[in-house]
Amino acid sequence: MSILPLIAANMCIASWGVAYMNVIVIGGVRDVYKRQTTDFTWVTGSQYIYSFDKCFFMPADFTGGLEYNQDNLTDDMWGYNRYTKQEVRIASAFFQNEWKNKQWSFLLGGRLDKHNMVDHVIFSPRANLRYNPTENMNLRASYSFGFRAPQAFDEDLHIENVGGTVSMIELAKDLTEEKSQSLSISGDLYHRWGDFQGNLLIEGFYTLLSDVFALRQIGERDGIIINERYNEKGAKVYGLTLEGKIAYRSLLQLQAGVTMQKAEYKQARAWSDDETVPMEKKMFRTPDTYGYFTLSYNPFVPMTIALSGTYTGSMMVEHKAGFIDKDIAVNTPDFFELNLKAGYDFNLYKGITMQVNAGVHNIFNAYQSDFVRGAKRDSGYIYGPGMPRSYFAGVKLSF
């Protein structure tokens, strides 16, 4: 048995800061406030790898390591006495061993995390099995466990502020981490027909969530709405994904995929502070069907034409009262967003390439049609494609 060790250490330091001012006019009164958000994150870690010619019954790779992550965030809204300071520290150790040959692979591993907002160490196991009955068939089964730690800051607070609502989040005394368990089974098929080659992936997935995070309004303090983050029973997401790819030489390539899923809570939950609003079991902003496709055509080497599209099925979205009289759950229409891009490459000098491109985003202008306006609008009532039909042109240099 031979052991080939590899030691890797890395450190990444990043900082980000943003400051901006909003002006709100409510009932003829002009209210100006400033808000500053700063976030500083740094990560360091090391990794150690052993490669075994044979570990018990077949060759294997062992990976182990340590990681430390710290994030310091402050969010200060001047004039509203809303100041949030959140410090997150995560110390982690991870390990896995993968036995593999051409036909089989078995992976067993886990991760230990100590989060400063959780009073115990969290163990997250994972396992993966691969079997290749033939060279053109790949079968996989995998299991993983994950968690999301409590946090008091939520970017949605900024969205609400745009609409004139000022709120803060407090953590419930008995709040615990949100946990997930995921299982997936897939089959990957490859085939070649003369100048054509294709690939088909079929995957079924099931994710079970427990102690799901939720928010409820518990009061008001100095004009600021106080929301409490607490744990609900749980939820599940399950479905099927189909993906395919076919290519003809280097001339034409088509790739497409579709996912059909169900995402729902174990029990119907109250999402509105108005007790007369019906509870919902279905997860908001999770369509039952969504998909994509990309078609690339290379009529000659320097030129590429790409047609792409995304489909988003109907989903349920919250529309809060203000502009409307009462909170309602809206079933959105489905959207198909089609894009076209053409590019031409010019070889400038010794490996330096310049590409000139142009195209159209969202050709059919599939876009939300019921935007609301005014001081009482729900600023979070936004769904669908991010922009209407738009035209673009660009230049890219590659070295």
Feature annotation, model-predicted:
Residues 59, 81-208, 296:
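Structural signature of Gram-negative outer-membrane beta-barrels, strongest in the C-terminal barrel
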Residues 312-320, 344-399:
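C-terminal beta-signal and adjacent terminal beta-strands/loops
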Residues 13-16, 140, 174-230, 236-238, ...:
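Membrane-embedded beta-barrel scaffold of Gram-negative outer-membrane proteins
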